[in-house]
Amino acid sequence: MERNDIINFKALEKELQAALTADEKYKRENAAKLRAVEQRVASYEEFRGIVLASHLKPLERKDKMGGKRTVPWNCHTIQGRTFQDVATEISPEKAPLQPETSADFYRDWRRHLPSGPERYQALLQLGGPRLGCLFQTDVGFGLLGELLVALADHVGPADRAAVLGILCSLASTGRFTLNLSLLSRAERESCKGLFQKLQAMGNPRSVKEGLSWEEQGLEEQSGGLQEEERLLQELLELYQVD
């Protein structure tokens, strides 16, 4: 067997374990989100707290304060370092984002795409249809806001149509209205800012070179501008942007 053909089982085991951990975290937080909705929590902060604490287990009667502990109560915090801190130290070679499931996307989004520009390019690379398939059932807790922030911070005129397609696909995902209602104030502002940018990108084209709407309609391919504007108006309503 060639040296290059030797399978690195240790690396495969680590990758599998990381994938299983990410999948478990995704399912655990989703379950916590549903529990919080059923409990009719009073505020977004309370809802967020329930989900972020989903990995914690309730203390049993035998667990007494001051007693000798052989296992850390919060296994996700070891010597002042959290699981997320350890996970972000793993920095494999950059590769195109190719998630097969929403759990894959969630893992790669958090581990391999730390910066806004990287996240934005990954969203453009996947495109609206692919994102719609990945999140057909639901967008994970807190993820919708992060997606909107990445789009709002880096959208450019050349990407206007692609971003509209992404927003359209996200709006068709399961429990979209619920996830939209759970956006933080900052995320809502980013969402509003994103649509303001998209509107501004469309307006200059309507008076480009002094052309009338009829003349410009002939210049635009297949009425692309009119279609974008129609879609933008629909999305403004879906995302509840005034």
From Swiss-Prot:
BP-aspect Gene Ontology terms: axonemal dynein complex assembly; cilium movement; determination of digestive tract left/right asymmetry; determination of left/right symmetry; epithelial cilium movement involved in determination of left/right asymmetry; epithelial cilium movement involved in extracellular fluid movement; heart looping; inner dynein arm assembly
GO cellular component, one term: cytoplasm
Stretches assigned to coiled coil: 8-32
InterPro entries assigned: CC103 (IPR042422), Dynein_attach_N (IPR031733), RPAP3-like_C (IPR025986)
Key word Cytoplasm present: yes
Membrane-crossing residue ranges in chain numbering: none
Record keywords, A-Z: Cell projection, Ciliopathy, Cilium, Cilium biogenesis/degradation, Coiled coil, Cytoplasm, Disease variant, Flagellum, Kartagener syndrome, Primary ciliary dyskinesia
Record's subcellular location: Cytoplasm; Cell projection, Cilium, Flagellum
Primary location group: cytoplasm
Any one GO molecular function term: protein homodimerization activity
Superkingdom of this protein's organism: Eukaryota
Quaternary structure, from the entry: Homodimer.
Family as reported in the entry's similarity comment: Belongs to the DNAAF19/PR46b family.
Record: disease: Ciliary dyskinesia, primary, 17: A disorder characterized by abnormalities of motile cilia. Respiratory infections leading to chronic inflammation and bronchiectasis are recurrent, due to defects in the respiratory cilia; reduced fertility is often observed in male patients due to abnormalities of sperm tails. Half of the patients exhibit randomization of left-right body asymmetry and situs inversus, due to dysfunction of monocilia at the embryonic node. Primary ciliary dyskinesia associated with situs inversus is referred to as Kartagener syndrome.
Functional summary from the UniProt entry: Dynein-attachment factor required for cilia motility.
This protein's name: Dynein axonemal assembly factor 19
Organism: Homo sapiens
Organism ancestry: Eukaryota, Metazoa, Chordata, Craniata, Vertebrata
